[in-house]
């Protein structure tokens, strides 16, 4: 089920996580004292908890390496008020260090990319698809991911952009991807994708969702709405706006062999409405109501249609 196995357990707080804009805290539980977990609070009146969970489950279906998320209702100081959160395991194994995209790009291209201190803003025009591709040239992928032998790190990253297009994720900025550095071997590995809360229209009001599903005005329809989704990746650093999610995906795949595109398009083609509905059915109605589930289902299917029509 979507609700976390940690429900009802006492969490032993370790430290706050400073990265990002949301409330986050690292914790352990008595059953697993050596395992660290990250609890990320959902902001009030948003669906950040269910959008994160749904994105994770879609990754499982598509074979995209992803941080695993579970929904956790949390008690607050006011006993009658519950806050929603998601819980994920620590992605950094012993002997590894996580390097965020902005820091890694600066390490690779110190003459081209700003320092992490200079690039605090999530929107950085030098965060281009081609620069990300070039930076990942010598980065490995984990054998446990079971990709075809010809797959390289950027081929997997194309899968991350496929996910972004499918869920209208508009937050693939340069701190929302990372590599893992193994200290003993001095090798770099691509990190699993993470942080997909800014997706699936989680910020929309029920009224807005209803309009998008029922309006006869093309400008107010779901197909028009999803066409506006933008990535935080650019084609050229002189561009005024970042790429649309579909264009970031198309550009990334255009750099790769055709068999990489075929691999990912087949994954999308085989994704069924039934499988998506099953993900939504695992979320209790008090966490995500039926109308919102219907909207999210239609949104994912609309994005699937866009991918199949535009990536060829």
Language model regions located:
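Conserved ATP-binding subdomain of kinase catalytic cores across diverse folds
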Residues: 1-120
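Short glycine/proline-enriched turns and hinge-like loops at secondary-structure junctions
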Residues: 50, 171-174, 204
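Short alpha-helical "patches" and their helix-cap loops
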Residues: 68-77, 173-183, 312
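ATP-dependent phospho-/nucleotidyl transfer catalytic cores
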Residues: 92-161, 184, 274, 281-286
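Active-site acidic catalytic loop and adjacent metal/ATP-binding pocket
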Residues: 155-198, 300
């Amino acid at each position: 089920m979507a609700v976390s196995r940690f429900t009802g357990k006492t969490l032993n707080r370790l430290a706050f996580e400073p990265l990002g804009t949301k409330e986050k805290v690292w914790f352990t539980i008595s059953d697993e004292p050596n395992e660290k977990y990250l609890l990320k609070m959902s902001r009030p009146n948003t669906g950040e908890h269910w959008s994160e969970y749904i994105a994770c489950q879609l990754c499982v279906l598509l074979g995209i390496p992803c941080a695993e998320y579970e929904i956790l209702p949390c008690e607050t100081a006011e006993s009658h008020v519950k806050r929603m959160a998601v819980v994920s395991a620590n992605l950094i194994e012993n002997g590894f260090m996580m390097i965020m995209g902005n820091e890694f790009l600066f390490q690779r291209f110190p003459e081209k990319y700003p320092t992490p201190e200079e690039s605090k803003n999530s929107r950085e025009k030098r965060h281009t698809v081609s620069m990300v591709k070039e930076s990942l040239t010598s980065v490995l992928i984990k054998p446990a991911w079971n990709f075809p032998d010809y797959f390289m790190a950027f081929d997997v990253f194309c899968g991350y952009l496929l996910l972004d297009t499918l869920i209208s994720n508009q937050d693939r900025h340069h701190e929302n991807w990372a590599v893992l550095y193994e200290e003993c071997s001095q090798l770099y590995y691509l990190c699993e994708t993470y942080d997909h809360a800014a997706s699936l229209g989680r910020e929309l009001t029920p009224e807005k969702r209803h309009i998008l599903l029922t309006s006869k005005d093309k400008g107010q329809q779901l197909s028009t709405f999803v066409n506006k989704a933008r990535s935080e990746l650019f084609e050229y650093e002189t561009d005024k706006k970042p790429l649309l999610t579909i264009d970031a995906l198309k550009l990334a795949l255009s750099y790769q062999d055709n068999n990489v595109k075929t691999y990912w398009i087949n994954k999308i083609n085989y994704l069924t409405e039934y499988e998506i509905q099953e993900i939504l059915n695992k979320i209790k109605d008090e966490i995500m109501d039926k109308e919102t589930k219907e909207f999210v289902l239609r949104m994912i299917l609309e994005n699937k249609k866009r991918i199949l029509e535009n990536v060829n």
